[in-house]
Amino acid sequence: MNSFSTSAFGPVAFSLGLLLVLPAAFPAPVLPGEDSKNVAAPHSQPLTSSERIDKHIRYILDGISALRKETCNRSNMCESSKEALAENNLNLPKMAEKDGCFQSGFNEDTCLVKIITGLLEFEVYLEYLQNRFESSEEQARAVQMSTKVLIQFLQKKAKNLDAITTPEPTTNASLLTKLQAQNQWLQDMTTHLILRSFKEFLQSNLRALRQM
């Protein structure tokens, strides 16, 4: 897992760097897997904004996979029954037909609002994940910061920013306190559910964004 941290999934500095270099006109930061020399080369074919978003989401998914691996290795949550999962009352964002993100009834504007709103709702859960990992602490932080960058990317594509719902800070603070006060078993279960749900949400995002 440590080798993953130093190669396939860069440290927090990458995500912090993206936040610092994100200008008003949708820039071309060097994403994971890109060669900075190739990005600057005059004869290379630059990635479109959609391609960069696609690559950025896949980068976050790689980080989630690493975090899930640590979670599964230290507990039996990944093998827990569906009944145990159903007992958890987390209200994690998920896609529904009305969100316009599925192939049937696809609506770009409605879908983009749902994606951004969902990512904003996930932020408090990603904050909860901080300090929940020992060997993957940097990866948890990088997933959180990369998600903030992704939100900024997508907001540049959205036409109806007023329709995007931002969670109330006081509500998030109360939820975070409640989650952190759970017993150890529930905290492990919460960690597992957040990672699993965030992975599924991002995978749905990928499929929807590729239609835009």
UniProtKB/Swiss-Prot annotation:
It is found in: Secreted. InterPro entries: 4_helix_cytokine-like_core, IL-6-like, IL-6/GCSF/MGF, IL6/GCSF/MGF_CS. GO terms for molecular function: cytokine activity; growth factor activity; interleukin-6 receptor binding. Residues 1-27 form the signal peptide. The modification Phosphoserine is found at residue 81. Keywords: Acute phase, Cytokine, Disulfide bond, Glycoprotein, Growth factor, Phosphoprotein, Secreted, Signal. PROSITE patterns: INTERLEUKIN_6 (PS00254). Its main location: secreted. The keyword Nuclease does not apply. GO terms for biological process: acute-phase response; glucose homeostasis; hepatocyte proliferation; interleukin-6-mediated signaling pathway; liver regeneration; positive regulation of cell population proliferation; positive regulation of multicellular organismal process; positive regulation of receptor signaling pathway via JAK-STAT. Coiled coil: none annotated. Disulfide bonds join 72-78, 101-111. Glycans are attached at residues 73, 172. GO terms for cellular component: extracellular space; interleukin-6 receptor complex. SUPFAM superfamilies: 4-helical cytokines (SSF47266). Belongs to the IL-6 superfamily. Component of a hexamer of two molecules each of IL6, IL6R and IL6ST; first binds to IL6R to associate with the signaling subunit IL6ST. Interacts with IL6R (via the N-terminal ectodomain); this interaction may be affected by IL6R-binding with SORL1, hence decreasing IL6 cis signaling. Interacts with SORL1 (via the N-terminal ectodomain); this interaction leads to IL6 internalization and lysosomal degradation. May form a trimeric complex with the soluble SORL1 ectodomain and soluble IL6R receptor; this interaction might stabilize circulating IL6, hence promoting IL6 trans signaling. Cytokine with a wide variety of biological functions in immunity, tissue regeneration, and metabolism. Binds to IL6R, then the complex associates to the signaling subunit IL6ST/gp130 to trigger the intracellular IL6-signaling pathway. The interaction with the membrane-bound IL6R and IL6ST stimulates 'classic signaling', whereas the binding of IL6 and soluble IL6R to IL6ST stimulates 'trans-signaling'. Alternatively, 'cluster signaling' occurs when membrane-bound IL6:IL6R complexes on transmitter cells activate IL6ST receptors on neighboring receiver cells. IL6 is a potent inducer of the acute phase response. Rapid production of IL6 contributes to host defense during infection and tissue injury, but excessive IL6 synthesis is involved in disease pathology. In the innate immune response, is synthesized by myeloid cells, such as macrophages and dendritic cells, upon recognition of pathogens through toll-like receptors (TLRs) at the site of infection or tissue injury. In the adaptive immune response, is required for the differentiation of B cells into immunoglobulin-secreting cells. PANTHER family: INTERLEUKIN-6. This is Interleukin-6.
